[in-house]
Amino acid sequence: LKKLKYYTFSSLFLILGVHLSFSQKAFTKEVGLISDNDLYTSSYYDRYYTNGTFLYFRYASKNSSVKKIHEFQIGHMMYTPQFANSFFPEAVDRPYAGYLFAKYSHLFFSPKNYGLKSSLELGVLGPDARAEDMQNLIHQIYGFNPTTGWNYQISNTFGINMGLVFLKPFSKTSKKRMDFTSTTTLKLGTIFTELNTNIYARINLFSTLLNTYSNSTLFESNLNRIATSQKKELFIFIKPQIGYALHNATIQGSLFKYDSPITFGINSFIYELEFGLKYAIKRFDLSYSVIKYSRKTDAIEEKINTYGQIKIAYKLN
């Protein structure tokens, strides 16, 4: 009888332990920081899209028959000419601009094997975004001199933007070594109006199957309300993209007033190539990528420019 009680209690503890270990995989929330900077790819260049900082919180919905993820984000983006110190307007080949915004996003995954993400963004473009202060702070950290030329920046304008992203995997099942997913993004508003389409290629560096697109760090979808068989992830990804732009207020200025000291016309067709490495294990997501993009205006001499992106995220139960 004692042996029976021992084995009974041992079995219960074992079952409970297994249950708890699987329950720990149901991470429902995530906080993260994304940092863009051209210094992540070169210690020499400091120009054009020179810095972006994004802080976010996202969580998985309760009591939903389909997977839904909500996100709140605060972001700041900074743009400068080729030379951060421009004493004369003739030296400005791309307007100085700063954009500060808050954004809400809603992502859901359909049983019909596609995902849809919608977003609403409110912000301010211009001196009120405090980009000059932010750049001087970054320069102080890196030991660079303070910048001049922000008196030529895009004037203040209110930002309201809506976004829609459609995700579609090429396959319904997980592939072991490589898979492909297409995304199409529409941005419509006073700051950016453009349409982009791309293809993500994931190349697995583990021997296990890739997580599905609806449960992967690449698509910001690895949050769940119930325990899953989610595995750690380590993969290389490549994303070629083509787009068509109708409006870019960081270059053209406001849609409603023409008081910016320097503005340029934009190139309608835009191209981009991103490649990098992503790693996700238990509570942590880490990634590094390089983004090469075509010039947004013909005033810029260089046809291709580059910046790097670093992401750090932490999951909560």
Language-model region placement:
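Bacterial Sec-dependent N-terminal signal peptides
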Residues: 1-28, 314-316
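Outer-envelope beta-barrel architecture signal
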Residues: 25-31, 66-70, 114-118, 174-184, ...
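N-terminal ordered "arm"
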Residues: 26-69
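Membrane-embedded beta-strand positions of outer-membrane beta-barrel proteins
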Residues: 31-33, 72-74, 104, 118-122, ...
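Transmembrane beta-strand segments that form the barrel wall of outer-membrane beta-barrel proteins
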Residues: 31-41, 178-188, 262, 288-294
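Outer-membrane pore/translocation modules
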Residues: 76-103, 107-217, 222-225, 247-265, ...
